[in-house]
């Protein structure tokens, strides 16, 4: 079947098979992450010419040197974040908007009353990608649960701080100070740290008394976090692929 003839039912079945695989492989461990990934149509968050690849477990290019993360990484980061309904989340690196939509389905589930909803704020430094994410989220039905901001994600988004959870989808040389400041006591951050050749995904916890505890959980490979508290443009070109 040609990619352009695939219909909604085909994508729904492909999504179901992918989610079942991620459950078997241990990336999806909770019912709420499973439900979120079954509900969010990844085919609406990739370029049209790549829609037929939406349910391959691989990153896909979305333009401007950026990618949409592989589904297993989205599942893993969402599980490590330990999201709950009603939480306020900051995502650094909106990309295509897919990961924000998955998180929105956890913190603001479609079948829950609006008064119980949390919200996802996602910040993107590339204006064209921010607009791409905004359009994708709107057509997928998440515009009222996700706010897209154009800006330097390494500085966070203090206007809506503090956050219960912060998810960073680009690799930083170290944990940006503003993100630590904007994390609630008792909150968690999931962030890739490292250079071009060696990165690890870290889970960072701010304890109730404000102490910071962090632990690496898995090797990974992300595009660079470019910004005042990340990599400079010229460093990103030579430090991270």
UniProtKB/Swiss-Prot annotation:
What is the organism field in this record? Hyperthermus butylicus (strain DSM 5456 / JCM 9403 / PLM1-5)
Listed NCBIfam families = pimt, PRK00312.1, PRK13942.1
Q: Which reaction does it catalyse?
A: [protein]-L-isoaspartate + S-adenosyl-L-methionine = [protein]-L-isoaspartate alpha-methyl ester + S-adenosyl-L-homocysteine
Q: Which UniProt keywords apply?
A: Cytoplasm, Methyltransferase, S-adenosyl-L-methionine, Transferase
Question: A GO biological process this protein is involved in?
Answer: protein repair
**Name this polypeptide is given:** Protein-L-isoaspartate O-methyltransferase
GO-annotated molecular function = protein-L-isoaspartate (D-aspartate) O-methyltransferase activity
PANTHER family per the UniProt record, alphabetical: PROTEIN-L-ISOASPARTATE O-METHYLTRANSFERASE (PTHR11579), PROTEIN-L-ISOASPARTATE(D-ASPARTATE) O-METHYLTRANSFERASE (PTHR11579:SF0)
Lineage, opening ranks: Archaea, Thermoproteota, Thermoprotei, Desulfurococcales, Pyrodictiaceae
Role played = Catalyzes the methyl esterification of L-isoaspartyl residues in peptides and proteins that result from spontaneous decomposition of normal L-aspartyl and L-asparaginyl residues. It plays a role in the repair and/or degradation of damaged proteins.
Which residues does the entry assign to the active site, renumbered to this chain?
A: 69
Q: Domain of life of the organism in this record?
A: Archaea
One cellular-component annotation, GO: cytoplasm
Pfam families (alphabetical) = PCMT
> Can the keyword Transcription be found in this entry's annotation?
no
Indicate where this protein resides in the cell.
Answer: Cytoplasm
- Give the EC number(s) listed in the UniProt record: 2.1.1.77
Family membership, please give it. Answer: Belongs to the methyltransferase superfamily. L-isoaspartyl/D-aspartyl protein methyltransferase family.
